[in-house]
Curated annotation (Swiss-Prot):
Motif Nuclear localization signal per UniProt: ranges: 274-280
Taxonomic source organism: Xenopus laevis (African clawed frog)
Record motif NAP1L motif, residues: 126-151
Broad class of where this protein is predominantly found: cytoplasm
PTM description: Phosphorylated by cyclin B-cdc2 kinase complexes.
Family designation: Belongs to the nucleosome assembly protein (NAP) family.
BP-aspect Gene Ontology terms: nucleosome assembly; positive regulation of transcription by RNA polymerase II; primitive hemopoiesis; spermatogenesis
Protein name according to UniProt: Nucleosome assembly protein 1-like 1-B
Length: 393
């Protein structure tokens, strides 16, 4: 009986020891995890480690997944067939955009009479009739106008005494100042010049010619330069790159050329003169040296960096051209067709509304994903990640 009791006690002691060992192992594991987290945090603060990690990630971009590499040879052949079909689709898409360009050229001619009349009104070459000036407003706006009518009576009397301004003064300057993309380019010393800007037009290449478009800036005679017309031409391409056909995503701007501005003496705002004092090391005499250096100005827009024959640009030139292409496209697609709405600010409000809606949709989607994660007991964060999408971003 004593042996049995001793045996049971021994088994109980062993179980207790196992429990103690398990607790000790768990405590040791937690300490190890804590140390690992601390070590990871220290490593991620090391610039050399981060640089090496970024280089490794860059190397992974565009590399095939392990699944693709593991496919049987016969399946890989079929995938290659699909890729060949994709190239043919890209070629058809290129033709589609070429025809879109032809449609733009055709309809540009239909828009032109309205744009010409717009220019005539802005520059006081034509006074619109009462019928042309009528504009139907919403009921709320109508009520607000009625309430303001009495307050405006005195101002109107004063306005009658003043000389009637011609056309719509500073129309294009106001448009530029209302649009962030353009206002960032306009310096204070540019504004007196842009007050003389009469019109901006877009001209498309003729049928059968390589795809391009020209922006025309028409100026009235002024004291700054002799040109009445400044131009910027953008060369486009709508065909897949043979070396990377899958990157095709519609027409792209390949380059641009500006024009020479004939500045009048002392009026070139793209240059500035600085004075620097120099002291002679031996004699100790001081002299003042003047030097001409580039100056920030909207009119640098007409002197873009030249793209070398090999197509390689330094980082600064590439950044300038990228911004230049964006501005040229924005002027062509948004500003010129809808300039009056940018003048009044209505188009800017519409753009802001579009961004707000996109932001709300994105927030909703994120909320739904988070809810799914919280309520799904089988949710695996690792499986939820999509490496391919991360690479594309």
């Amino acid at each position: 009986m004593a042996n049995i009791d001793n045996k049971e006690q021994t088994e109980l002691d062993q179980q207790d020891m196992e429990d103690v060992e398990d607790v000790e192992e768990e405590e040791t594991g937690e300490e190890a995890n804590s140390k690992a987290r601390q070590l990871t945090a220290q490593m991620m603060q090391n610039p050399q480690v981060l640089a090496a990690l970024q280089e490794r990630l860059d190397d992974l971009v565009g590399t095939p997944t392990g699944y693709i590499e593991s496919l049987p040879k016969v399946v890989k052949r079929r995938v290659n067939a699909l890729k060949n079909l994709q190239v043919k689709c890209a070629q058809i898409e290129a033709k589609f955009y070429e025809e879109v360009h032809e449609l733009e050229r055709k309809y540009a001619a239909l828009y032109q009479p309205f744009f010409e009349k717009r220019s005539d009104i802005i520059n006081a070459s034509y006074e619109p009739t009462e019928e042309e000036c009528e504009w139907k407003v919403d009921e709320e706006e109508d009520i607000a106008e009625d309430l303001k009518e009495k307050a405006k009576l005195e101002e109107e009397k004063k306005d009658e005494e003043k000389e009637d301004p011609k056309g719509i003064p500073e129309f294009w300057l106001t448009v530029f100042k209302n649009v962030d993309l353009l206002s960032d380019m306009v310096q204070e010393h540019d504004e007196p010049i842009l007050k003389h800007l009469k019109d901006i037009k877009v001209k498309f290449s003729e049928a059968g010619q390589p795809m391009n478009f020209m922006l025309e800036f028409h100026f009235e005679p002024n004291e700054f330069f002799t040109n009445e017309l400044l131009t910027k031409t953008y060369k486009m391409r709508s065909e897949p790159d043979e070396s990377d056909p899958f990157s095709f995503d519609g027409p792209e701007i390949m380059g641009c050329t500006g024009c020479l501005i004939d500045w009048k003496k002392g009026k070139n705002v793209t240059l500035k003169t600085i004075k620097k004092k120099q002291k002679h090391k031996g004699r100790g005499t001081v002299r003042t040296v003047t030097k001409t250096v580039p100056n920030d100005s909207f009119f640098n827009f007409f002197s873009p960096p030249e793209v070398p024959e090999n197509g390689e640009l330094d980082d600064d030139a590439e950044a300038i051209l990228t911004a230049d292409f964006e501005i040229g496209h924005f002027l062509r697609e948004r500003i010129i067709p809808r300039s009056v709405l940018y003048f009044t600010g209505e188009a800017i409000e519409d753009d802001d509304d579009d961004y707000d809606e996109e932001g709300e949709e994105a927030d909703d989607e994120e909320g739904e994903e988070e809810a799914d994660e919280d309520h799904d007991p089988d949710f695996d964060p690792k499986k939820a990640q999509n490496p391919a999408e991360c690479k594309q971003q």
